[in-house]
Structure formats: structure tokens, C-alpha cells
């Protein structure tokens, strides 16, 4: 259900007195000046917005290939909070971020001690989008959070125009390469569903995606034999 509201965030200016009768939701004072960011994807968005200096700490440093973030962690200007599945709570308490940005895990049952720190937890559910442009539009939410609204709107407008132009280029292509993707992990081979962002991306790029007719919006676990 793409119309269902999963969570509400109430953004109030840092210098603004809290108004009476705020809607129910997680209160976030903006602009966020010091965030703990779990995902390399969201670090990339903040890099595009020129807001790396707003990242006070990260998780899973080994997956973040952004030189400025690597350098800031090495010099101690940015906190490495360790593994996103089991972050270093003491480090997080010490630098006390304005907000914690993470990707929600399905049926996770919550985030343990993180939820008890009194710090706004922002669940970035962009991975649940079913189109590449839908996912990229999350940059506008980040713009609101970090005081970069104008830059975010401009960036999304440019990305959208470029993407649609590229989609038009492949509409008349008759020869479409067949595509499968991902790798076997454990006993299953997880492939993007036909209605997933990645599945749509392959199709928009002019590929004949093997699971294009599949109705799933997430990953599908298949056996090695099924894939081959």
C-alpha cells in the first residue's frame, strides 16, 4: 500500500518557539546540524547537497567510498560508530547527534537502546519506493531536514529531466539485451522484483529484464537452479 503513512515527522525551525497543537509525530529541529547517518546511500545524498559537514557520525565506514568522509573519520572530525546492526552506543551518547538517520529493517522489532537516547530517529524508507525517480525524490526530504531545500529541489528537477530524456532515447530501441542480476547469498539468489526500483531501472534503460513481469516491489529469493 503505497498510500499508507508509515511515520510522521514534524519539522520545526531551530530558533522557532514550539507552537501549540503540533501534530503527532517525531519532532525534529531543523536544520539538522549534526547527524548520525547509517547508510552510504544517504551519505551520498548529503554529499550531493554539499552537507557532508552536517554528518557528525557514520556507521559501516567500510562501505562508504566518499573520500571526504573517510578523511574526516581518520582525523577524528567524524565519529565512526561501528556496525549499523550493533552501533557503539557510548560513542553516540558522547557526540549526541541532533538526529539519527537509518534505513528501517522489516520486522526488526525496533532499534534497541538507540530509541531510548532521546534523539529523533528518522527512518529513511527510500528503498521502499517502486521507481528510480521516486527514490531520488527523497533528496527533497533531506533538503528540508538540513536546510538545503532550494538545492535539493533544483537537484531533483535536473535529475528528473535527465532521466526522462534518457528513457525517451531507448523507447525506439528494438534490440534489448537480456539482464539478470545480483549474486547467490547462502541458499538463495535474491533478484530484484519486476516492480522494484532496480527492476524499473533495468527496463527504463532498455534492457529485457528476465523478471520484468513479476509483481514484487522488493527482492525475490530464488534457487540457483531457477536463475540458471
Functional labels for PLM-detected ranges:
Residues 190-220:
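Alpha-helical, coiled-coil/dimerization segments enriched in small aliphatic residues
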Residues 220-228:
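Ligand-binding pocket segment of bilobal, Venus flytrap-like solute-binding proteins
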Residues 28, 77, 94, 98-189, ...:
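Extracytoplasmic substrate-binding proteins
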Residues 27, 84, 106, 183, ...:
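Short, glycine/acidic-rich beta->alpha junctions
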Residues 46-50, 111-113, 192-195:
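Short, solvent-exposed loop/turn and secondary-structure capping segments
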Residues 45, 91, 113, 201, ...:
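Hydrophobic/aromatic ligand-binding patch that stacks against planar heteroaromatic rings
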Amino acid at each position: 500500500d503505497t498510500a499508507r503513512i508509515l511515520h510522521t515527522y514534524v519539522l520545526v525551525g531551530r530558533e522557532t518557539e514550539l507552537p501549540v497543537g503540533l501534530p503527532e509525530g517525531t519532532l525534529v529541529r531543523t536544520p539538522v546540524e549534526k547527524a548520525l547517518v547509517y547508510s552510504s546511500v544517504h551519505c551520498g545524498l548529503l554529499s550531493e547537497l554539499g552537507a557532508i559537514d552536517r554528518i557528525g557520525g557514520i556507521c559501516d565506514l567500510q562501505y562508504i567510498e566518499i573520500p571526504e568522509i573517510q578523511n574526516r573519520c581518520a582525523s577524528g572530525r567524524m565519529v565512526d560508530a561501528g556496525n549499523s546492526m550493533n552501533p557503539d552506543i557510548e560513542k553516540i551518547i558522547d557526540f549526541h547527534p541532533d538526529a539519527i538517520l537509518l534505513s528501517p529493517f522489516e520486522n526488526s522489532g525496533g532499534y534497541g537502546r538507540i530509541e531510548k537516547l532521546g534523539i529523533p530517529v528518522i527512518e529513511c524508507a527510500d528503498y521502499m519506493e517502486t521507481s528510480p525517480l521516486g527514490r531520488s525524490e527523497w533528496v527533497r526530504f533531506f533538503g528540508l531536514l538540513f536546510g538545503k531545500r532550494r538545492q535539493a529541489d533544483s537537484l531533483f528537477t535536473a535529475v528528473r529531466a535527465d532521466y526522462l530524456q534518457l528513457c525517451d532515447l531507448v523507447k525506439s530501441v528494438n534490440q534489448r539485451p537480456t539482464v539478470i542480476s545480483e549474486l547467490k547469498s547462502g541458499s538463495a539468489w535474491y533478484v530484484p522484483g519486476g516492480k522494484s526500483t532496480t527492476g524499473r531501472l533495468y527496463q527504463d534503460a532498455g534492457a529485457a529484464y528476465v523478471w520484468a513481469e513479476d509483481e514484487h516491489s522488493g527482492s525475490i529469493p530464488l534457487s540457483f537452479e531457477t536463475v540458471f
